[in-house]
């Protein structure tokens, strides 16, 4: 009969640091997790700092080794506990300091969360009976129960690469060509994790549109998030706040998943076809944050306060509303964002929103009418707010009401179109356009009853341009 494997005896960190070159087993609260690195032998290492009631400061540094990135500890929350077995205590810095090594051959670990200490990750060689350690975890939790704010403060400091030197920007503060650091939520990651979509609840500033006149006759090509992802994916996204795409090397996003909060360091913003594009630099880094990190909580407080406001679905950049540029027939309907419209659960509905008109197709006002008698008017306008772009038709009576004139006066119509799209009258060459914000009413409808969602379209109605 095989001899039953004995479970290792737990010791406290204060005692462990005295047992140099010996293997120990212990439980601690994770205070810090540093960015993983690849070793020369192609293994991976990440460094954790843990504490217990006997060694709350500065804590014990544990270097965890694994064959792959995915096998490294992936801390989910503040106050999560980690159980290490058979880690080796060792000295460094000429014997002045002590740390521990969690070998992938001999040592093992397990991570626990919640009041019931549910194990959510363990190394492949972890074979201990979890129940044997829950009493020790419960005792440790009770010791720190009244010190959670202190632990959070210590964790907030330890997540900094240089204490008191980090300054994070909101998306509403980005500028062309200026490097910045961002705290954001990952909403979606491509299958190969080469690109992610990020959000922080704020509105990126409207980007100037730079296009040659020869290009204006082409249909507008947008890089808006809704053109890159399916509607099913968009349904899980917030409908307020700008969502931007970030391209990163797959090794930087090796364990990023939707719902994660991260710090992105050393990003760079550019504008492509009127849309913001976030690019990485040679020094870009990704650091994970716990859901209850103070920075995350601050962002969500700001976002929740915005949603509670009647004007929360209006872009920050046109707040409170563009006065006197247009008038609408439905002044009682609440304002919505374009993402609200795109993800609305019904195919047909009426909406009121504040947008910019960033493109018109066809471009020449002489082509707005499709017949010689100039009775049938149709133009496709590309609308934009801080959340998305949306193409909406402006047709016939709705168009005549919108422009406030008949279609015979092409010169006046051209001036109104130029003002609406932010075109400078005197410019014949490449010039940036910055269209004004206008209030408008939009109707969603379908053209095929048998396939309503795939034939869903939009048109502007009940809106009059006053300029």
UniProtKB/Swiss-Prot annotation:
Question: Where is this gene product found?
Answer: Nucleus; Chromosome, Telomere; Nucleus, Nucleolus; Cytoplasm
| Organism, as annotated | Arabidopsis thaliana (Mouse-ear cress)
Gene Ontology molecular-function annotations: RNA binding; single-stranded telomeric DNA binding; telomeric DNA binding
Biological process terms from the Gene Ontology for this record are: positive regulation of telomere maintenance; positive regulation of telomere maintenance via telomerase; telomere maintenance
S-S bonds? none
Matches recorded under SUPFAM superfamilies: Nucleic acid-binding proteins
Q: What is this protein's name?
A: Protection of telomeres protein 1a
Tissue specificity, per the record, is:
Expressed in roots, rosette leaves, cauline leaves, stems and flowers.
Q: Which residues form the signal peptide?
A: none
The record's PANTHER family line, in alphabetical order, gives:
PROTECTION OF TELOMERES 1, PROTECTION OF TELOMERES PROTEIN 1
On whether Nucleus is a keyword of this UniProt record, the answer is yes
Q: Which Pfam families match?
A: OB_POT1A, POT1
Superkingdom of source: Eukaryota
Q: Which CDD domains match?
A: hPOT1_OB1_like
Which InterPro entries does the entry link to? NA-bd_OB-fold, POT1, Telomer_end-bd_POT1/Cdc13
Location (main, coarse): nucleus
Complexes and interactors = Component of the telomerase holoenzyme complex at least composed of TERT, CBF5 and POT1a. The RNA molecule associated to the telomerase complex, and providing a template for telomeric DNA synthesis, is most likely TR and not TER1 as described previously. Interacts with the N-terminal part of TERT. Interacts with CBF5. Interacts with CTC1 and STN1. Does not interact with TEN1.
The entry's family comment says:
Belongs to the telombin family.
**Which UniProt keywords are listed?**
Chromosome, Cytoplasm, DNA-binding, Nucleus, RNA-binding, Telomere
Result when mutating residue 221 to A: Reduces POT1A function in positive regulation of telomere length; reduces binding affinity for CTC1; has no effect on binding affinity for STN1
Gene transcribed to yield this protein: POT1A
